[in-house]
From Swiss-Prot:
Residues binding Ca(2+): Y27, G29
Protein name, per record: Acidic phospholipase A2 Omo-E6
Listed transmembrane segments: none
Major enzyme class: hydrolase
InterPro entries in alphabetical order: PLipase_A2 (IPR001211), PLipase_A2_dom_sf (IPR036444)
Length: 29
């Protein structure tokens, strides 16, 4: 499920601190 995948990305992002999600062009620090 795409929603679960996005949640996984967010969890990884929270740990790594910085990430870029091309599909939405989202930059989160």
């Amino acid at each position: 499920d795409l929603m679960q995948f996005e949640t996984l990305i967010m969890k990884i992002a929270g740990r790594s601190g910085v990430w870029i999600y091309g599909s939405y062009g989202c930059y989160c620090g």
